[in-house]
């Protein structure tokens, strides 16, 4: 399941593009998540009232949360699979406080792949998409194991 060094380099190359605009990428990813899977919006008291894409695009809170999500994910990706320290508090909050099912992490992973491909087609070809998909699967597998340790079966 681990990634090769070459795969990690593909992931981190496109991630550098994301970091140039974490808020913009994050907002677009969350909008795609919420539009594709409206049930996920119910987990966010702060955003439940946002019904249209225009409202979502106008929300500074959504933009800030997108920045927060991608900052955390970037920190995990940069650890190249050695993300235990970063993952533990994230799993704790998502399992016990927010109660985010693993399925929702699959949904946001799909949104990430889609947005990166649409925004960076020349840097996110088939090899990079496969590497990012693998990295996100590793993240989900490891967070699911933490969920299980915490007794959360979301």
From Swiss-Prot:
Function: Monomeric heme protein which primary function is to store oxygen and facilitate its diffusion within muscle tissues. Reversibly binds oxygen through a pentacoordinated heme iron and enables its timely and efficient release as needed during periods of heightened demand. Depending on the oxidative conditions of tissues and cells, and in addition to its ability to bind oxygen, it also has a nitrite reductase activity whereby it regulates the production of bioactive nitric oxide.
Residues bearing PTM Phosphothreonine: 68
Binding residues for heme b: 94
Family to which this protein belongs: Belongs to the globin family.
Cellular component GO terms, alphabetical: extracellular exosome; sarcoplasm
PANTHER family given in the database record: MYOGLOBIN
Domain Globin, residue spans: 2-148
InterPro entries given in the database record: Globin, Globin-like_sf, Myoglobin
Lineage: Eukaryota, Metazoa, Chordata, Craniata, Vertebrata
Keywords per UniProt: Cytoplasm, Heme, Iron, Metal-binding, Muscle protein, Oxidoreductase, Oxygen transport, Phosphoprotein, Transport
Record's subcellular location: Cytoplasm, Sarcoplasm
Modified residues (Phosphoserine): 4
The enzyme's E.C. designation: 1.7.-.-, 1.11.1.-
Enzyme class: oxidoreductase
Annotated source species: Indopacetus pacificus (Longman's beaked whale)
UniProt GO MF annotations: heme binding; metal ion binding; nitrite reductase activity; oxygen binding; oxygen carrier activity; peroxidase activity
Record protein name field: Myoglobin
Catalytic function, reaction form: Fe(III)-heme b-[protein] + nitric oxide + H2O = Fe(II)-heme b-[protein] + nitrite + 2 H(+); H2O2 + AH2 = A + 2 H2O
Subunit structure: Monomeric.
């Amino acid at each position: 399941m681990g990634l090769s060094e070459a795969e990690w380099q593909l992931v981190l190359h496109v991630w550098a593009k994301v970091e140039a605009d974490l808020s913009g990428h994050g907002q677009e990813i969350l909008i795609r998540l919420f539009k594709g899977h409206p049930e996920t919006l119910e987990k966010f008291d702060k955003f439940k009232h946002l019904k249209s894409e225009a409202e979502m695009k106008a929300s500074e809170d959504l933009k800030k949360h997108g920045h927060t999500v991608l900052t955390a994910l970037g920190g995990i990706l940069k650890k190249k699979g050695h993300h235990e320290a970063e993952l533990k508090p994230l799993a704790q909050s998502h399992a016990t406080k927010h109660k985010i099912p693993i399925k929702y992490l699959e949904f946001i992973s799909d949104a990430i792949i889609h947005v990166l491909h649409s925004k960076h087609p020349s840097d996110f070809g088939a090899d990079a998409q496969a590497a990012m998909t693998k990295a996100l699967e590793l993240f989900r597998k490891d967070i699911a194991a933490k969920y299980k340790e915490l007794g959360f079966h979301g």
